[in-house]
């Protein structure tokens, strides 16, 4: 990823700032491993035994087959999970990508709530509504555990 950001007097590249190693704490590391493992497990569910439940969450306005959407999102989840677990050099970019992914799949959670779809143990409107509020937590978890928040702060001080 390479784009130029102009900071009043001199250009800096986003690539240089985001790809540099950002030191994280033990807690961030542990939570990144947990989230990466969760993503790999979710991907396995998408690709195998939970495919039908995930298909039920795909909004009807998406112009692709529900099965294709579930398979593609499972592949993306697997790649992001592996990236969270092993791609240290690009950890910040993987965290940003995972945060964006969580935002992109949010309409599926909204569809589950608005259409009262029972899946993954969410069998009441209250449970489905609470799940909606968990999505921002996942976005922040991805960004914080990978050091992306710190990288953004460092970038803003230039």
Show the residue positions of the predicted features.
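Membrane-interface extramembranous regions
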Residues: 2-158
């Amino acid at each position: 990823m390479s784009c130029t950001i102009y900071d009043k007097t001199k250009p800096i590249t986003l690539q240089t700032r985001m790809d540099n190693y950002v030191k994280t704490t033990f807690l961030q590391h542990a939570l990144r491993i947990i989230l990466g493992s969760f993503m790999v497990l979710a991907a396995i569910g998408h690709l195998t035994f939970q495919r039908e439940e995930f298909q039920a969450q795909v909004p009807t306005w998406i112009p692709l087959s529900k099965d294709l959407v579930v398979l593609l999102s499972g592949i993306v989840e697997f790649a992001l999970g592996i990236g969270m677990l092993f791609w240290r050099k690009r950890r910040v970019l993987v965290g940003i990508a995972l945060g964006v992914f969580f935002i992109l799949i949010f309409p599926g959670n909204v569809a589950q709530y608005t259409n009262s779809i029972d899946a993954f143990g969410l069998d009441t409107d209250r449970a489905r509504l609470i799940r909606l509020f968990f999505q921002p937590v996942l976005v922040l978890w991805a960004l914080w555990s990978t050091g992306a928040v710190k990288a953004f702060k460092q970038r803003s001080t230039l």
